[in-house]
Amino acid sequence: MLAVRRRGLRVLAVAPLRVRGLATTSTEFMEGEALTPKTVGPYMSERLEEFRPERIRNFSIVAHIDHGKSTLADRLLESSGNISRQERESAQFLDNLKVERERGITVKAQTASMLHRDSKTGESFMLNLVDTPGHVDFSYEVNRSLSACEGVLLLVDCSQGIQAQTLATYYAAKERNLHVVPVLTKIDMPHAEVDDSILSLSSLLDVDPDEVLLTSAKSGDGINDVLPAVVERLPPPVECDPAAPLRCLLVDSYYDDYRGTVCLVKVVDGAISPGDKIYSAHQKTKHDVQETGLLLPGRYKTKGLYAGQVGYIIAGMKSTTEAKVGDTFFREGAASADLKALPGFQEARSMVFASMYPTDDSSFDELRVAIEKLTLNDASVTAQQETSGALGMGFRCGFLGLLHMEVFHQRLSDEQGIQVMVTAPMVPYTVIDPNGEHLTVETPGAFPESTKYYEILEPMVEASIITPASYLGPVLALAKEKRGVQTNLVYLEDERIIVTIDVPWQEVVTNFYNELKTISSGYATLNYREIEPQKADIVKVDLLINGKVLDALSFVCHRSRATPDGRALCQKLKRVIDRQQYEISIQAALGGKIFAKERIAPYRKDVLIKSGKTVGGGDSTRKKKLLAKQKQGKRRMRTVANVQLSQDAFWSVLSK
């Protein structure tokens, strides 16, 4: 059977589909004319009430990072007439952020409504597509996108095969009882392993090989089969009642400079129109609906949204903090009519914390405004003002993961033009004091100096690593070095192995991913999920410069790593701190005891030479007075002077 499919692929490779032919699914809608980006909006708006729940399909594209989700989404948008060929070829249409296009990743989930006509029955269907991020840090975005869907396209790059995040998104979809359509992409690549990928899907995920779609978003091969499969194999919105009182699910939100918060919603029951007054089930707030519409993916205003449909509403919210993802909206006055909020509400929880300080103290207000603007579009970032003795005023920010932190840092520079100093990331620890009280510690400064009478709970994750069998030894060695415990080992058909380990979350955010890629020559992939915290011997290491503790450079680690990490940090700081006219002493302390020290020697001016001549001639008393005066001046300078620390000093902590 696989051999037959392989022969079919060869035929496709010889005669690839023409891009112009991709729009066939949209023909004959308007007296024989295909829909275009200018006509698709008016056509759908005029017939919006005709799209009952049974003629709607809500679906997501899920996959590992860089497996081609956004590229496939652009192809589908082109095939349905939402975007032109030129728009599709110029850039990935659903990736709007500069950081997304520079890194080639999706950070912010986007949505687009499409129109498709069934060639067999002639019926037209509304297809609502959600393009989701692929990196594990943004699994929160993936999960909230899945809450608005009844099915997913599980995308697998057949040149790379099933990866760690592929499995994670598949299981997330199955937990929600979503229907899955497997799709292989990049079949036109020279090193594509189509047969092996189909076998892996069949054995690992129990997928019928005959149901796997074969596509190439780059060349257009197989794209015409995707939307018909969505209509035939995915169910319509379930438990939707057009006659029931309004209930709609808040899926996402973003901030518009002119209109305020734009809410992406799925209407579950009833209908919503401009002028309606709505009530938030979790926020307990009331809002007036000013505008409703579809995302095509640009906003297109409509006279309402109906049961089963996904679109946007503008309700006069001034900030995305008023729009909690997963919230339920009722019509005002109906909250007392025994209506239940839709399940799945869960606030994003920060997993990594780091402090951000302006490079110039006078730029603090600019940094505050910049962070406020970015958090309007990313409600999963938390920011709290703090003060450091060494760096002045700044913000303690919480993120979903290390990549999330790096993306936020880059957006501050790209979009707001703000340069900041970022401290080493830290995960939240639970400290149990002698009275049994549980405290969550997010900064090294709040960590107890001595843990003799305290119990520390360390956050843990279950990490799934897919690696070629030849790299199993180095991967297990890395896991042991990071205090990981192996819990499972599964062999795949294509000489790859799934290794499951329980590992401290702090070890994962501290360069674990880069080291894994290095030892596996880039072949290993990583996915993780949070599990129960465990007791651990965690201590705080203080960094002192000229006897002063710098809270911004202190860090928390396991006791076994305190001495080597502290020594390494002192040595790195010695290399990045500029030499001064006075001696600089760099020390690392644990529990008040110094265990590592580095010295930066001062510049020495020869005070015994003036204008090329020796001062005092042969008078030794005069020379001793000059040397003693110089020594006293250097001691005074060391006492009152401040050592200037660059961003390199903080990144040396980050890469320890």
From Swiss-Prot:
Listed SUPFAM superfamilies: EF-G C-terminal domain-like, P-loop containing nucleoside triphosphate hydrolases, Translation proteins
Top enzyme class: hydrolase
Main localisation: mitochondrion
CDD domains given in the database record: EF4_II (cd03699), EF4_III (cd16260), LepA (cd01890), lepA_C (cd03709)
BP GO annotations: positive regulation of translation; translation
Superkingdom as given in the UniProt entry: Eukaryota
Residues of the signal peptide: none
Family as reported in the entry's similarity comment: Belongs to the TRAFAC class translation factor GTPase superfamily. Classic translation factor GTPase family. LepA subfamily.
Protein name: Translation factor GUF1 homolog, mitochondrial
